[in-house]
Amino acid sequence: MFYSIFIIDKEGSGAQRVPAVEAHRQYIKDRAHKILAAGATFADDGKTVRGGSYIVEMDKDEVERFVAEDPFTLAGIREKVIVQPWIKACFNGEFLITVTPPGPPDVNERLIEPERKSA
């Protein structure tokens, strides 16, 4: 099952973040096969890290361990963590949910046309 994880870090936790960065990156790299997307989120200045967000394919227990054992969590910088089940409704330019009435059943619609390569 997919889960979204949205994390807000404690205000002013940048100094605590720095020593944990390399361990956090390795932690994420080691679990990349379970992560559909991940990245930092920023304050309005576009420079100050405020947390992160992830889309992961794990069961609920794995998600809880994933968050709890993250070096940033262990460094004490997390203020709030929101975990919710997530469905892949639109991905990579495609709408993936089966159309329900009034459209025909079992039809997937494209939101954008793929780029065509010139000959």
Walk through the language-model features, giving the residues of each:
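Conserved, structured core segments of small domains
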Residues: 1-119
